[in-house]
Amino acid sequence: YRGVKNPVLIVAKGNDGVMPSISDGAKIYSGNVPGFDGQYVVEITDPDVKSVTISVGEVSTQFRVLNLPTPTIKIGEYWSGNEIPKSVFTNSTQLDAVIDDVNFPFKDVEYTVTQYSYMTEANGITSSHVVNGNKLTEELLKDIKKKRSGDKIMFIGIKVSTPAGPRNAPGYTAKLK
């Protein structure tokens, strides 16, 4: 995976003490990643590399390089598409970007929302308000307080910081309870 330290366990008969090598676009070194088996660590250094080859002696194995999972947005414990009580906005005053992939092995990877747009509607006119950071602004919270049960809230253009660099997240839409 790009942006994380990948654990590698190498078992190569007859090559004890031989340091593995890796193709361009990555680096390999002795070490371990907490919580994983492995005596080597691979880090991807080229953001465009699609695969890397690890070699030990005469044996080489190619590995596909994967991107980190797409960020998913939550407000409190509520996912996009959920009905969300207005009271949530008194306790949860930010957009959280999380990894919603049960097969992703790295549980300590963190994402942070860096920018979003909040869609508002007044007198039939829709407009968006760009916010830098992940906090819900006072203006936005006041707008939500005015809304009624059944009204929708929508966040678009969500930008997220990840260990592998900036990413775009899908929008967030919810209906107020």
What are these regions (language model features)?
Residues 1, 24-37, 123-143:
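Low-complexity "stalk/linker" and mucin-like segments enriched in Ser/Thr/Pro/Ala/Gly
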Residues 1, 63-90:
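Low-complexity, Pro/Ser/Thr- and charge-rich linker/hinge segments at domain boundaries
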Residues 1-8, 92-99:
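Short coil/turn motif common to extracellular beta-sandwich-like domains
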